[in-house]
C-alpha cells in the first residue's frame, strides 16, 4: 500500500504549486485533505514509509483521511523529521487536521488557546498550550507546503496564535501573583488580566509576519499607579515576576515541548533594565537616547496582550519619536547608516545557496526590510501613507509614491515571498530557529524538495540569482555615500542581538572575542557612556565605529587597541568634539589607535586623563617640541606642587610620546624634550622641597645645587629613564645651624635631598614621576646622601675611580639656589674632568670595566640596544673615554654622546671614520630605542610584535621593511664595536 502510494506521487513544478494555491483561495470551505498538492519529490521513500507506518499504528480507523492525502504528505514527512514526529506523537492529530477546513481548524485552535486564560491549574495550562502549538504547527506546515495557504495566511496564523497564547499566558502569570497575594485580582475585558500592564509586539510579531519557528519579540510595560498591587508589594517586583512567569509558561521545555521562545530584548536598553519597565521610564529613554534602529523596530509595534487602552496611549505617545516631520542632514545620514553598515560587494561576486543566511546574509530578508524601513523613517514623518507596519504593504506604498520603481517593487516583493517560504522550509525540517540553508547537499535537498524543486543544481542557481538580485537593488539605495562597513565585511550593530556576518567580520579582523566587541559597541550605541549620551554623539559614533575597528585591525594587535580605546572612550565626559576631531583627521585617529595598541603607558594616560587629548587640538602640536619655561605651581605648597608636577609630567610625556609614535620628531629632539621636562620638574620641586625643609627645620645659611648624571645629564632620556642625581651644598659658615631645629649643614641638606627624592619618586593621587638613583654620588651608598662642595672636590681629586670620572662627563647642573653657586658647581665638575691622567691606565680601566659588564650583564640579544656589543654602552664609553683622555689638553667636553662624538671628530682627536661610524650607530640606536621605550614593556621581544609595530620600527630605522632593519642594525653594531675597540685600544 505505502509503496504504491509513494510511486504515484508525481513531481509538480513551482508554477503548478502556485496555481494550486490560487485555486485554494477560490474554494469554498472543504476538507484540507481534498485541497492538498504535493510540494515536491519524495527524497527518502524509506523515511516516508516509516512515518506512514508509525502514524497508522496510532491513527486506527482515522487512517483513511491520511491515505487519501498521502500523495501530498509523503514528500513532507520524507524531508521533515519534525513534522513526521508531530503526526506520530498524537495519532488523532493528523486525521483531525486533514478532515477539517483549515480556516475552521485554525479558529478552533485559537479559541482553545484563548480559553487557557481561565484554566485554574498552571501545569494544565502549560500542557494544553504546548499541545495546541503542535496542532498549529502541523496545520500551518501542511497548509503551506500543500499549496492551500499563501504567505500572508501562514504568517497570519502563526501570529494570531502567538497573540492568543500570550494573552492566556499573561492571565496565568497574573493568577500566580494573585495566589501569592501580590496582586488583588485578575482583570478582564479591555484592561487585560493585569490592568495597567501590556505587551507590545515588535518585529515580525508586530507586523503579523511571524516565521515558522520564530521566537516572539515583545516588550512589557506597566503604569505602576494602575497595577492592582496588594499592600506591601512593589509594582516593579510584581511586573518582573510576571515577565518571568511568561518565560516559564511559553518557552520552558517540558515533556510536551515548548510554545514559543520569547525575546524581551527590544525593550529600552535591555542590558541594564528589568524585563518589565514602567511606562514613564520607557518614554524618557526613547525621548533621550532612542536610536534609529529602535524607531524602525517600532514601525511594526502594536499591542498584543494586556491593557489595550494603556498600550494604545503608550504607542500614541511614541509616534513623534518614530515619525519625525523634520530631519536634519546628520539625522538623515544616521538613518542611512542602518543600511550602510552592511558591506556592499561588487555585483559580480558569487552568491550561493550553500550555507546562505536567508535572513541576515547578503541578498537576504533583512536587506529588503532595511530597504523599506530606512525610507519609511526618512519619508514617513511627512507622508503618513508610508507608515504600514507590513514590509510588502510598505514597499507597495513607496512604489505608489514614486520612491521605488514599479519594477524594483515587484521584483523585491516576489523575492521577499520566496525568501520567507525558503526560511519556513528550512525551519520545518527540525523546528530549528535557523535562517540558513544547509551547507550539506543532502540536507539542502530537503529544503529544495519542500520548495518544489528536485534538482539541487537548479535550486541552488535559482536561490543564488535571487540573492544576487536583492543585493544589487539594496546596494543601489543611498549609493555613493560613506560606507560604514569594512573591507572585511559587514559591521552591523543595530538591534540587540549579534549579527552573524558582523561576528564573522570581526573574527576576520583578528578580534579574539567578536561577541564581546559587538556587545561593547552596541552598549555605546545605546548611550551607556557619556560620549554617546547625546543624539549627536551617537550619530558621530555610528561613523566612527567602523574606522575604529579598521584602525585596530591595522595595528596587528586589535584586542589591545580596542580594549584600551574602550577604557579611554568610556571615560570621556562628552564625545562630540573629540569624535568630530577623529572623523575630520583620520590619520590622527589612526595614530591614536596605534598608541592604544603599542604604548600602554600613553594609553593609560588617555584613559585616566582624557583631557590629555586636548593637546591634539593645538595647531602647534606637531611643531617644535617646547617645554614650559617656568613650573606652573607655587613652591610654598609642597603637596600641591607634587600633584601639579605629576599632572604636568603626564601631559608633557603624552605629547612627547605621541610624537615618538607618529615618527614626526627626531630621536635627539625627543631625548632633549624628555630631559628638559625633567629639568623643569626638578627646577620646580627643588625650591618646594627646600621651602618644606625650611618650614620644618628653619632656614639654613648656605647654597645647594642639583646635578643630573646619566641620560638625564646627557639629555638622552627616553620614556622610561630614571634620574641619576647628586646634590652639592656649601654652608656659609661650617658652624651654622638651621633656625628652628638646630640642624647642621649635613643634616639639613640630607633632609632636603630626601624630601626632593620623595617629591620626584613617591606616588600620589596624580600618579608617579621618576625612579631616582643617588648611587653615582661620591662613595655611592656608603657616603652621605648630600655631598658637601669640599668633599666633592676632594673626592674627584684624590679618590674617584675611572668609571666615576666617565660618569661625570655627563654631569649637568639642573638647578641651584643661586646663579653663583651653579657656576661654581659647573667649574668644579670641569676641573675634576680636566685634571691630567695617564692615557694607558684610563684605556685599560675602560676595557676592564666593559669586560666586567659583559660578564655580569651580558646583552640579551639583537634588540638589546644598550648592552649588546656595539650597543649604546660601547658608543658612550668610547665618547666618554676620548673626552676624559683629552680634557687636560683643553679637549671638548659635551654631556650629550652625539654632540661629544661630533666635537671630537671636528677636533681631530681620533680617527674620523671610526667616530663617524660610532655616531651613525648611536643615531640609529637612539631612533629605535625611543620608539621601543615608548611602546613596549621591558624585556619585550620585538620579533613577536605585530607587523604594524615592526613597520613603525622600520620607519624609525630609516628603512621601508622590517626585514631590512635587522641587517642594518647588525651592521651598525658591528661597525660600532670595531670603532670602540679601535678608539679605546688604540
Swiss-Prot record:
Transmembrane segments: none
CDD domains xrefs: NT_GlnE_GlnD_like
Catalytic reaction equation(s): [glutamine synthetase]-O(4)-(5'-adenylyl)-L-tyrosine + phosphate = [glutamine synthetase]-L-tyrosine + ADP; [glutamine synthetase]-L-tyrosine + ATP = [glutamine synthetase]-O(4)-(5'-adenylyl)-L-tyrosine + diphosphate
The EC number(s) this enzyme carries: 2.7.7.89, 2.7.7.42
InterPro entries: GlnE, GlnE_rpt_dom, NT_sf, PII_UdlTrfase/GS_AdlTrfase
Gene Ontology molecular function terms on file: [glutamate-ammonia-ligase] adenylyltransferase activity; [glutamine synthetase]-adenylyl-L-tyrosine phosphorylase activity; ATP binding; magnesium ion binding
Keyword Iron-sulfur found: no
Cofactor(s) annotated in UniProt: Mg(2+)
Role played: Involved in the regulation of glutamine synthetase GlnA, a key enzyme in the process to assimilate ammonia. When cellular nitrogen levels are high, the C-terminal adenylyl transferase (AT) inactivates GlnA by covalent transfer of an adenylyl group from ATP to specific tyrosine residue of GlnA, thus reducing its activity. Conversely, when nitrogen levels are low, the N-terminal adenylyl removase (AR) activates GlnA by removing the adenylyl group by phosphorolysis, increasing its activity.
Protein name as catalogued: Bifunctional glutamine synthetase adenylyltransferase/adenylyl-removing enzyme
Organism: Caulobacter vibrioides (strain ATCC 19089 / CIP 103742 / CB 15) (Caulobacter crescentus)
Amino acid at each position: 500500500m505505502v509503496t504504491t502510494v509513494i510511486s504515484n506521487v508525481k513531481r509538480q513544478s513551482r508554477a503548478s504549486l502556485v496555481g494550486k494555491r490560487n485555486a485554494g483561495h477560490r474554494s469554498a470551505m472543504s476538507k484540507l485533505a481534498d485541497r492538498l498538492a504535493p510540494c515536491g519529490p519524495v527524497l527518502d521513500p524509506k523515511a516516508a514509509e516509516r512515518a506512514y507506518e508509525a502514524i497508522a499504528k496510532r491513527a486506527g480507523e482515522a487512517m483513511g483521511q491520511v491515505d487519501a492525502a498521502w500523495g501530498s504528505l509523503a514528500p513532507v514527512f520524507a524531508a521533515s523529521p519534525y513534522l513526521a514526529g508531530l503526526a506520530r506523537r498524537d495519532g488523532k492529530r493528523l486525521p483531525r487536521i486533514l478532515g477539517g477546513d483549515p480556516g475552521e481548524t485554525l479558529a478552533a485552535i485559537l479559541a482553545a488557546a484563548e480559553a487557557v486564560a481561565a484554566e485554574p491549574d498552571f501545569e494544565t495550562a502549560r500542557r494544553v498550550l504546548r499541545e495546541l502549538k503542535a496542532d498549529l504547527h502541523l496545520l500551518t506546515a501542511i497548509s503551506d507546503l500543500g499549496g492551500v495557504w499563501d504567505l500572508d495566511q501562514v504568517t497570519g496564523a502563526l501570529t494570531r496564535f502567538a497573540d492568543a497564547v500570550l494573552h492566556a499566558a499573561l492571565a496565568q502569570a497574573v493568577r500566580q501573583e494573585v495566589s501569592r497575594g501580590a496582586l488583588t485580582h485578575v482583570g478582564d475585558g479591555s484592561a487585560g488580566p493585569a490592568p495597567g500592564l501590556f505587551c507590545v509586539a515588535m518585529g515580525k510579531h508586530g507586523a503579523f509576519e511571524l516565521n515558522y519557528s520564530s521566537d516572539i519579540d515583545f516588550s512589557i510595560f506597566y503604569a505602576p499607579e494602575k497595577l492592582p498591587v496588594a499592600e506591601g508589594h512593589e509594582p516593579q517586583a510584581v511586573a518582573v515576576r510576571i515577565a518571568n512567569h511568561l518565560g516559564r509558561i511559553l518557552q520552558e521545555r517540558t515533556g510536551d515541548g515548548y510554545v514559543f521562545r520569547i525575546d524581551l530584548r527590544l525593550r529600552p536598553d535591555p542590558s541594564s533594565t528589568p524585563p518589565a519597565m514602567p511606562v514613564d521610564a520607557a518614554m524618557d529613554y526613547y525621548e533621550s537616547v532612542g536610536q534609529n534602529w529602535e524607531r524602525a523596530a517600532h514601525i511594526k509595534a502594536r499591542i498584543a496582550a494586556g491593557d489595550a487602552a494603556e498600550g494604545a496611549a503608550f504607542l500614541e505617545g511614541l509616534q513623534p519619536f518614530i515619525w519625525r516631520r523634520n530631519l536634519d542632514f546628520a539625522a538623515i545620514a544616521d538613518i542611512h547608516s542602518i543600511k550602510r553598515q552592511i558591506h556592499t560587494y561588487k555585483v559580480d561576486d558569487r552568491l550561493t545557496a550553500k550555507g546562505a543566511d536567508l535572513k541576515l546574509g547578503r541578498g537576504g530578508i533583512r536587506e529588503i526590510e532595511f530597504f523599506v524601513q530606512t525610507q519609511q523613517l526618512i519619508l514617513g514623518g511627512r507622508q503618513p501613507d508610508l507608515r504600514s507596519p507590513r514590509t510588502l504593504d510598505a514597499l507597495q506604498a513607496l512604489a505608489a509614491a514614486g520612491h521605488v520603481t514599479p519594477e524594483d517593487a515587484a521584483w523585491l516583493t516576489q523575492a521577499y515571498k520566496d525568501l520567507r517560504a525558503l526560511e519556513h522550509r528550512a525551519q520545518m525540517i527540525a523546528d530549528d530557529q535557523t535562517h540558513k540553508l544547509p551547507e550539506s547537499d543532502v540536507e539542502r535537498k530537503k529544503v529544495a524538495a519542500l520548495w518544489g524543486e528536485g534538482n539541487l543544481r537548479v535550486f541552488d542557481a535559482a536561490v543564488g540569482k535571487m540573492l544576487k538580485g536583492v543585493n544589487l537593488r539594496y546596494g543601489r539605495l543611498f549609493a555613493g555615500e560613506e560606507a560604514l562597513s569594512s573591507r572585511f565585511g559587514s559591521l552591523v550593530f543595530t538591534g540587540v542581538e549579534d549579527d552573524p556576518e558582523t561576528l564573522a567580520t570581526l573574527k576576520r579582523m583578528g578580534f579574539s572575542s567578536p561577541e564581546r566587541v559587538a556587545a561593547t559597541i552596541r552598549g555605546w550605541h545605546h548611550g551607556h557612556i557619556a560620549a554617546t549620551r547625546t543624539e549627536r554623539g551617537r550619530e558621530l559614533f555610528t561613523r566612527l565605529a567602523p574606522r575604529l575597528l579598521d584602525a585596530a585591525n591595522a595595528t596587528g594587535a586589535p584586542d589591545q587597541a580596542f580594549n584600551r580605546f574602550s577604557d579611554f572612550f568610556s571615560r570621556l565626559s562628552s564625545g562630540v568634539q573629540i569624535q568630530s576631531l577623529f572623523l575630520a583627521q583620520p590619520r590622527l585617529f589612526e595614530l591614536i589607535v596605534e598608541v592604544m595598541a603599542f604604548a600602554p603607558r600613553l594609553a593609560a594616560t588617555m584613559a585616566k586623563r582624557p583631557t590629555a587629548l586636548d593637546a591634539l587640538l593645538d595647531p602647534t602640536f606637531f611643531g617644535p617640541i617646547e617645554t614650559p619655561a617656568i613650573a606652573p605651581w607655587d613652591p610654598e605648597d609642597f603637596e600641591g606642587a607634587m600633584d601639579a608636577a605629576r599632572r604636568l609630567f603626564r601631559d608633557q610625556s603624552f605629547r612627547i610620546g605621541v610624537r615618538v609614535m607618529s615618527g614626526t620628531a627626531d630621536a635627539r629632539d625627543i631625548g632633549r624634550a624628555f630631559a628638559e621636562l625633567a629639568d623643569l620638574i626638578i627646577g620646580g620641586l627643588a625650591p618646594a622641597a627646600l621651602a618644606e625643609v625650611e618650614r620644618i627645620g628653619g632656614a639654613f645659611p648656605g647654597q645647594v645645587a642639583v646635578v643630573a648624571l646619566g641620560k638625564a645629564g646627557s639629555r638622552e632620556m627616553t620614556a622610561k629613564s630614571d634620574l641619576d642625581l647628586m646634590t652639592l651644598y656649601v654652608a656659609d659658615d661650617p658652624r651654622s645651624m638651621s633656625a628652628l631645629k638646630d640642624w647642621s649643614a649635613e643634616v639639613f641638606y640630607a633632609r632636603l635631598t630626601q624630601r626632593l627624592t620623595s617629591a620626584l619618586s613617591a606616588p600620589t593621587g596624580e600618579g608617579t614621576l621618576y625612579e631616582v638613583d643617588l648611587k653615582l654620588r661620591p662613595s655611592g651608598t656608603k657616603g652621605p646622601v648630600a655631598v658637601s662642595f669640599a668633599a666633592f672636590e676632594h673626592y674627584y681629586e684624590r679618590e674617584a675611580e675611572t668609571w666615576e670620572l666617565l660618569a661625570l662627563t655627563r654631569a649637568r647642573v639642573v638647578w641651584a639656589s643661586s646663579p653663583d653657586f651653579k657656576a661654581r658647581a659647573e667649574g668644579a665638575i670641569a676641573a675634576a674632568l680636566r685634571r691630567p691622567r695617564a692615557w694607558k691606565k684610563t684605556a685599560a680601566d675602560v676595557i676592564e670595566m666593559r669586560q666586567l659588564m659583559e660578564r655580569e650583564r651580558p646583552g640579551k640579544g639583537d634588540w638589546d640596544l644598550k648592552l649588546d656589543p656595539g650597543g649604546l654602552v660601547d658608543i658612550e664609553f668610547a665618547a666618554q673615554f676620548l673626552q676624559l683622555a683629552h680634557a687636560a689638553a683643553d679637549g671638548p667636553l659635551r654631556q650629550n654622546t652625539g654632540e661629544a662624538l661630533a666635537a671630537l671628530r671636528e677636533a681631530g682627536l681620533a680617527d674620523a671614520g671610526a667616530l663617524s661610524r660610532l655616531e651613525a650607530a648611536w643615531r640609529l640606536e637612539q631612533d629605535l630605542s625611543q620608539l621601543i621605550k615608548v611602546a613596549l614593556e621591558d624585556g619585550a621581544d620585538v620579533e613577536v610584535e605585530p607587523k604594524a609595530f615592526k613597520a613603525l620600527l622600520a620607519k624609525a630605522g630609516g628603512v621601508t621593511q622590517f626585514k631590512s632593519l635587522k641587517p642594518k642594525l647588525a651592521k651598525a653594531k658591528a661597525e660600532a664595536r670595531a670603532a670602540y675597540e679601535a678608539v679605546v685600544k688604540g
